[in-house]
Amino acid sequence: MDPHELTLLEAAAALHTRQLGHLEYVQALLAQTDRLISLNAWISRDPEGLVLQAKALDKASSAPSEHLPLAGIPVAIKDNIDTSDLPTSGGTRSLLDARPQRNAPVVDVLLQAGALIAGKTNLHELALGGTTNNAVSGACRNPWNPLRIPGGSSGGSAVAVAARMVPAALGTDTGASVRLPAALCGVVGFRPSTGRYASPGILHLSPTKDTVGPMARCVADVAWLDGLLAKDRLHLPNVSLKGLRLGIPRGDFFEGADPQVLAVIEQALDTLVAEGVVCVTLDVPDLKQHNDATGSTLVMFEMMQSLPAYAKAQGLSMDALLAGVGSPDVARILSRQLGHERVTAAAYAAALARRQKLQAAYARHFADHRLDALIFPTCLMTAPLIGQDDRVHLSGRQVPTFQTLIRNTDPGSNAGLPGISLPAGLTAEGLPVGLELDGALGTDRHLLAVTAAIERVLPRLPRPPVVQA
C-alpha cells in the first residue's frame, strides 16, 4: 500500500515499528500534496520544516515512546485555530500575516502526542459560510469533482484528508462546518458535545456553539483523536448492531432532498435494518420550530463580540478587519450586523431561552423512544458547483445555498449535541453522500461506537478520481 493511503492508526503503527520511515512517510504525503495543489486545500505550509522533523525522528536511536503515539504523523489544522509557528489568518486578508503567540490547547495536545503540523487549511472566509469559495485565499475544490465545492467552512481540512495529503485534520464546527465538508468529500467528520474539547485559541464566531472537530477517513481514527483531545479512552468498545435503536426524523430532515441522495440513504437504512437495527420513525416538528428561533440569532450576536475581541488581540480594529474581507457573502453579513440589522441583546436572550427548549425537546425524543442515535442525511444535496454562493437548484427549486447546506446539521449544533457524518455511498454521478448520526448530549463515546459498527456494514468508498489519476 502506498504510504499516503494509510489511515492515521495504520501509519502510527507502521512508524512505531519502523516498518515505515518517517522521512519516507512525510515525503509521500508532500508528493501527494504537490500533485494535487490545484485543489487549493492549504493557506500556509512549511514542507521544509516537516522534512527536517522527519529526518530527526529517523535518526533517533530508538522507536518513539508510547507516550508519543502520533510521532511523525502530519495533521492538518484549519486556519482559524491558533498555531505559533504558522499564521492564523481566518482566510481573510487583514490576518494573513497574523502570528499568535501560542498554540491553541487542542494543537498542543496533538504536538505533545508527537504529531507534526502539516499546515493550515483553507476555509470559508472567517468561517462564515458553507462553500469555502474564498475570495481571499481562492476557491477550495472537491477531489471528487474539482468544479464543485468541498463544503465548509472547514473545506480545506476535508479536502486534505480525502485527497490523501494527510491522514487526519482538525476543523471547527458552528452549525455544520466539520460534518458538511466531510459529507461532500466522502470522509468522516465529528462534532463533539459542545465543551468536550478545550476552546481557547480559536477565531470564534459563537462560543455557545463553536467546537473543534476531528476529520479522518475512518471512524476508528476520529474516535482515537476524540479520546486524545477529550482526555478520554482512546479505543472504542465493540457495539452490536442487533437491537440498536435509531430514530429517523422524517419530515424536515428528508423532505425536498435530492432523489439521488435519498436513494443512497434509504439503501444504507435498509442495510442497517437487515443487520438487526430497530429504526423508529419520528415526527419532530418541535426541533425545527425551536431551531429556527435560535441558531442565526445566537451566532450573529456572539460573532459581534468575538470577532472584535480577536481582531483587537492582533492589533486590528473591527473596521480594519472588515476592510480586508474579500468574499461578498461574508462582507454582507458583517455589514448588516454593523448596521441597523444588528441582533439586539433582547433577541439574543430570547434565543438562549429557545435553545433550552430545543435541548429539552431533543432529550425528550431520545428518552421517549430509547434511542441510541438519530440518523438522517448530513446534507440534502451533493456538492454544488463552485460559484453558487447565494442560491442552488435542488429538486426542481431554487433555494438559498447556505441555509440548504446546513439545514440538517444546524439543529443538533444549536442543542450542543455530538454529531458525526460518515460516507454512506456514491450517487449515480459519483458524488459522496454523508450519513449523519446525532447522539444525546454527552454520549460522545457511545455515538462513536455505534457509528463504527454502522461503518463496518456500509460500502467503503473508492478513492476520489483525482487520487486515482
Predicted features and spans:
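Short helix-loop capping/hinge segments that flank enzyme active sites or metal/cofactor-binding pockets
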Residues: 70-90, 243-245, 301-363, 381, ...
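An N-terminal boundary/leader segment
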Residues: 1-55, 267, 274-276, 463-469
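Immediate post-signal peptide segment of exported/extracytoplasmic ligand-binding proteins
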Residues: 57-74, 239-247
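Structural helix-boundary/capping segments
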Residues: 35, 112, 163-255, 266-275, ...
